[in-house]
Design a protein with these regions (language model features):
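Extended ligand-binding clefts on enzyme/binding-domain cores
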Residues: 2-142, 156
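C-terminal hydrophobic structural anchor segments
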Residues: 129-173
Length: 173
């Protein structure tokens, strides 16, 4: 059983780029990157890359805007590929993905940089301040500064990781 699971994990790892890396997305052009990892691709029969252009339902968005093209959905989840040892922090695909993440999701706050989970996130209160009821507006998550600090540390940038730790601490209430 262990061999089967190891072989399956190796096969999946070998397909990550086919399943989730796009080189023709608008965000790459906008950020000056060669490509980026997308948040999720729906199961599509046939060619794996076809899924990167399929529609994905984001359930915490209002029904009129719930569907978004997979290649338009950028997420900080990409950093997990480095944290889990599946990609090196200096892998050009990771470096370009971080460039896109910063272009799309980074927001400068009084405490320092912050990141939203993904573009179009609807988890949060509404624009008028009313509470989340299944849809809303996604905001910056202080915890994501800590996740970015992990990446910076693995990339050998201890000073930046320490700065991001201070950003996360300053964001607490």
């Amino acid at each position: 059983m262990a061999g089967f699971l190891r072989d399956t994990a190796d096969a999946w790892e070998a397909k990550i780029d086919d399943w989730l890396y796009v080189t023709d997305g608008a965000w790459a052009r906008d950020a000056g990157a060669s490509g980026y990892y997308i948040r999720v691709a729906p199961p599509v029969a046939g060619e794996a890359r076809a899924a990167t252009h399929a529609m994905v339902e984001v359930r915490n968005r209002d029904l009129c805007n719930a569907d978004i093209p997979a290649d338009a959905l950028v997420s900080t989840d990409t950093l997990a590929l480095v944290r889990f040892g599946l990609r090196a922090p200096d892998d050009p695909r990771i470096v370009d993905s971080v460039r896109v993440i910063d272009h799309v999701l980074r927001q400068e706050l009084p405490t320092g940089p912050g990141w939203r989970r993904y573009n179009g996130d609807g988890y949060g209160e509404h624009a008028d301040g009313s509470p989340f009821n299944g849809t809303g507006i996604g905001r910056v998550w202080p915890l994501l500064a800590g996740e970015r600090a992990h990446y910076e540390l693995l990339a050998g940038r201890k000073a930046e990781a320490t700065r991001l730790l201070a950003v996360m601490e300053a964001s607490g209430s």
